[in-house]
């Protein structure tokens, strides 16, 4: 399934989806949602909404750093997971980075998150692990 991916400033949709998708990980790891941090980071991100038939089904948030695009959020609504939307979003992020002359994608993911399989399949490699979070990177050729 191929989503339409468009720029968005729909902070409410993004926050709701992120909080919902991350709640179990936060609870399991004893983490808490930091609204102030989300507010601050939201203003710094290039954010995109994934749509299927005009229905919002996911969010992708990117931040350009010195030599890499950092995928700060890639969230897909549960009913739409495992249907290729995450893969489509990663391809979009790669094209976006390449267009900007950037040749690395980076992300951080909970080590217990099943999305690890997707990231590894897409060529991301673990750089380091701290506090149950993997820092991963993929070089874009």
Name each model feature, range by range:
Residues 55-63, 70-75:
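Conserved beta-strand in the GNAT
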Residues 1-11, 139-141:
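Conserved N-terminal entry element of GNAT/NAT acetyltransferase domains
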Residues 9, 15-41, 45:
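Conserved GNAT-fold acetyl-CoA-binding loop/helix
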Residues 47-53:
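Cytosolic beta-strand hydrophobic patch enriched in CBS
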Residues 76, 82-95, 120-121:
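Conserved acetyl-CoA-binding loop-helix of GNAT-fold acetyltransferases
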């Amino acid at each position: 399934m191929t989503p339409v991916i468009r720029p968005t400033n729909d902070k409410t949709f993004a926050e709701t989806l992120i909080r919902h998708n991350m709640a179990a990980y936060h609870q399991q790891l004893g983490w808490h949602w930091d609204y102030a941090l989300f507010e601050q980071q939201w203003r710094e991100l290039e954010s995109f909404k994934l749509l299927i038939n005009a229905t919002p089904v996911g969010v992708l948030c990117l931040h350009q750093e010195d030599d890499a695009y950092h995928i700060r959020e890639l969230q897909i609504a549960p009913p739409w997971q495992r249907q290729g939307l995450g893969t489509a979003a990663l391809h979009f992020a790669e094209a976006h980075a390449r267009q900007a002359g950037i040749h690395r994608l980076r992300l951080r993911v909970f080590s217990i998150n099943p999305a690890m399989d997707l990231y590894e399949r897409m060529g991301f490699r673990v750089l380091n692990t701290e506090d149950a979070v993997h820092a991963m990177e993929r070089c874009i050729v």
